[in-house]
A protein has these predicted regions:
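Class I SAM-dependent transferase core
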Residues: 2-66, 104-105, 111-118
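Conserved SAM/SAH cofactor-binding pocket of Class I
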Residues: 58-136
C-alpha cells in the first residue's frame, strides 16, 4: 500500500488531521535520515514506512480513550507505536510516555519529539516513573 492510500485511511477511518499527517511526514524524514546511520528499521521496510510502521501503529487509536490518562510505550525503539500515537493525540488531553534504554534511540526520540512539538515524555529506563504512572 502506497503513502497516498495510507493517508486516506488515516484521515477517513482513523480521523488523523492534516496537521497530524504533516507531522508524520516530518517524522518519516527524520527516521530515514537517522536510519542511514543507526539502522532503526530494516532497510527493506524503508519503502513501506507508511503502511508497515505508521498505519500499523495508528490502528491502536480505535482502542484508546484519548480523552483522559496516558499511555506507556515500553522499549520505544524508533518510536512505534508511541510517537505515532502522540502525533495523533495532539488535540487531546492525553500524554504518551516513551521508555527507551538505548542512548542512541533516546537521542533520536528526544530530537523528534522536540522538532515535531508533540505531547510525549521520554524516560531513560523502562522502570523510571512507570510505577507512579500505573493505576491499579
Amino acid at each position: 500500500m502506497q503513502e497516498p492510500e495510507v493517508i486516506k485511511i488515516l484521515q477517513e477511518e482513523l480521523k488523523f488531521t492534516d496537521q497530524s499527517i504533516d507531522k508524520l511526514k516530518m517524522y518519516e524524514i527524520e527516521l530515514l535520515r537517522a536510519n542511514k546511520k543507526y539502522n532503526f528499521i530494516a532497510k527493506s521496510t524503508e519503502g513501506s514506512i507508511w503502511s508497515r510502521h505508521f498505519l500499523d501503529s495508528a490502528q491502536l487509536v480505535k482502542y484508546i480513550n484519548f480523552r483522559q490518562g496516558s499511555l506507556s510505550d515500553l522499549g520505544s525503539g524508533a518510536g512505534f507505536p508511541g510517537l505515532v500515537l502522540a502525533i495523533y493525540n495532539q488535540n487531546f488531553n492525553f500524554h504518551v510516555k516513551l521508555y527507551e534504554k538505548s542512548p542512541v534511540k533516546r537521542d533520536f526520540l528526544d530530537a523528534t519529539i522536540n522538532k515535531l512539538k508533540i505531547n510525549a515524555e521520554l524516560y531513560p529506563n523502562v522502570f523510571d516513573g512507570i510505577i507512579e504512572s500505573l493505576s491499579l
